[in-house]
Amino acid sequence: PRFISVGYVDDTELVRFDSDAENPRYEPRARWMEQVEPEYWERNTQIAKDNEQSSRVDLRTLLRYYNQSAGGSHTIQRMYGCDVGSDGRLLRGYEQVAYDGCDYIALNEDLKTWTAADMAALITKHKWEQAGAAERRRAYLEGACVEWLSRHLKNGNATLLRTDSPKAHVTHHSRPEDKVTLRCWALGFYPADITLTWQLNGEELTQDMELVETRPAGDGTFQKWASVVVPLGKEQYYTCHVYHQGLPKPLTLRWEPPPSAVSNTVIIAVLVVLGAAIVTGAVVAFVMMRRRNTGGKGGDYALAPGSQTSDLSLPDCKVMVHDPHSLA
């Protein structure tokens, strides 16, 4: 089985371990992490390798709990970390475990008790209660987690507290039955929180809007899109609105017809005065050009929603770490 461990502060990846790498080691993914002492990488590489082995045991345990065969693909996901406020104090700690994409067990907000999602998870819950797992996790979340988050914020504040404003545009995609899809794209933004909405004459179209999850662009920024289906010829009544921390004010966009379509229309209008025969030829030429140009300019980048306020003081930040204890 493949084991991957990733650490984040807010939307920025810090460190990564991948058991399928040629030389599996904990590696920095953010530039400021290169300042960390070598002992950190040695220590956490060994922890990751230990966790890889314990995760194999956990996987076999869950296969037994759910009476499943070893064939096929199965996944255990763990996420735990801490949220701190602008004063550096702990706001919330958490640990969540999922199996094959479904909730399994989670640490409650009191950091003292667990919630099991099903009968199999109850077995793990009872074992963890007897072993004092919640107390150990609470000690980590209130101690080392907060300390490391403070250190990351100090070393990486230029990256973590930056804002990259989204670049937005609207594309036009043909559909059958005199309908078109208008898709509003937001690209290259950071942090990931963003809101995209479509409006018709000032009324929000939340029920009729298709929205994708915010996606990483691979360069430290994010992308998202939202689309609506509208009647052909009514595109100008629809507006896309983009809200993001990096914008001085929200963006309002409409679909803009390509310049070639506008210039063709002007040519036809001028030729009309030259006589019926010439007008007929001009109309035929215009229709042919329109057919050649029919279709939207698509793209496979995306844009997505989620609101963020613009606060110049230090925002609340989160850190996620992966250091599992056994489910067995």
Swiss-Prot record:
<keyword id="KW-0490">MHC I</keyword>
<keyword id="KW-0325">Glycoprotein</keyword>
<dbReference type="GO" id="GO:0042612">
    <property type="term" value="C:MHC class I protein complex"/>
</dbReference>
<dbReference type="InterPro" id="IPR050208">
    <property type="entry name" value="MHC_class-I_related"/>
</dbReference>
<dbReference type="InterPro" id="IPR011161">
    <property type="entry name" value="MHC_I-like_Ag-recog"/>
</dbReference>
<feature type="modified residue" description="Phosphoserine">
    <location>
        <position position="310"/>
    </location>
</feature>
<keyword id="KW-1015">Disulfide bond</keyword>
<dbReference type="GO" id="GO:0042590">
    <property type="term" value="P:antigen processing and presentation of exogenous peptide antigen via MHC class I"/>
</dbReference>
<dbReference type="GO" id="GO:0048839">
    <property type="term" value="P:inner ear development"/>
</dbReference>
<comment type="function">
    <text>Involved in the presentation of foreign antigens to the immune system.</text>
</comment>
<keyword id="KW-1133">Transmembrane helix</keyword>
<dbReference type="Pfam" id="PF07654">
    <property type="entry name" value="C1-set"/>
</dbReference>
<feature type="transmembrane region" description="Helical">
    <location>
        <begin position="266"/>
        <end position="289"/>
    </location>
</feature>
<dbReference type="GO" id="GO:0042605">
    <property type="term" value="F:peptide antigen binding"/>
</dbReference>
<feature type="topological domain" description="Extracellular">
    <location>
        <begin position="1"/>
        <end position="265"/>
    </location>
</feature>
<feature type="region of interest" description="Alpha-1">
    <location>
        <begin position="1"/>
        <end position="71"/>
    </location>
</feature>
<keyword id="KW-0472">Membrane</keyword>
<feature type="glycosylation site" description="N-linked (GlcNAc...) asparagine">
    <location>
        <position position="157"/>
    </location>
</feature>
<feature type="modified residue" description="Phosphoserine">
    <location>
        <position position="313"/>
    </location>
</feature>
<feature type="glycosylation site" description="N-linked (GlcNAc...) asparagine">
    <location>
        <position position="67"/>
    </location>
</feature>
<dbReference type="GO" id="GO:0030670">
    <property type="term" value="C:phagocytic vesicle membrane"/>
</dbReference>
<dbReference type="GO" id="GO:0002485">
    <property type="term" value="P:antigen processing and presentation of endogenous peptide antigen via MHC class I via ER pathway, TAP-dependent"/>
</dbReference>
<comment type="similarity">
    <text>Belongs to the MHC class I family.</text>
</comment>
<dbReference type="GO" id="GO:0009897">
    <property type="term" value="C:external side of plasma membrane"/>
</dbReference>
<dbReference type="InterPro" id="IPR010579">
    <property type="entry name" value="MHC_I_a_C"/>
</dbReference>
<feature type="disulfide bond">
    <location>
        <begin position="184"/>
        <end position="240"/>
    </location>
</feature>
<dbReference type="GO" id="GO:0001916">
    <property type="term" value="P:positive regulation of T cell mediated cytotoxicity"/>
</dbReference>
<dbReference type="InterPro" id="IPR036179">
    <property type="entry name" value="Ig-like_dom_sf"/>
</dbReference>
<dbReference type="GO" id="GO:0001913">
    <property type="term" value="P:T cell mediated cytotoxicity"/>
</dbReference>
<feature type="domain" description="Ig-like C1-type">
    <location>
        <begin position="166"/>
        <end position="252"/>
    </location>
</feature>
<comment type="subunit">
    <text>Heterodimer of an alpha chain and a beta chain (beta-2-microglobulin).</text>
</comment>
<feature type="region of interest" description="Alpha-3">
    <location>
        <begin position="164"/>
        <end position="255"/>
    </location>
</feature>
<feature type="disulfide bond">
    <location>
        <begin position="82"/>
        <end position="145"/>
    </location>
</feature>
<dbReference type="GO" id="GO:0010977">
    <property type="term" value="P:negative regulation of neuron projection development"/>
</dbReference>
<protein>
    <recommendedName>
        <fullName>H-2 class I histocompatibility antigen, K-Q alpha chain</fullName>
    </recommendedName>
</protein>
<feature type="region of interest" description="Connecting peptide">
    <location>
        <begin position="256"/>
        <end position="265"/>
    </location>
</feature>
<keyword id="KW-0812">Transmembrane</keyword>
<dbReference type="InterPro" id="IPR037055">
    <property type="entry name" value="MHC_I-like_Ag-recog_sf"/>
</dbReference>
<feature type="region of interest" description="Alpha-2">
    <location>
        <begin position="72"/>
        <end position="163"/>
    </location>
</feature>
<dbReference type="Pfam" id="PF06623">
    <property type="entry name" value="MHC_I_C"/>
</dbReference>
<dbReference type="GO" id="GO:0042742">
    <property type="term" value="P:defense response to bacterium"/>
</dbReference>
<keyword id="KW-0391">Immunity</keyword>
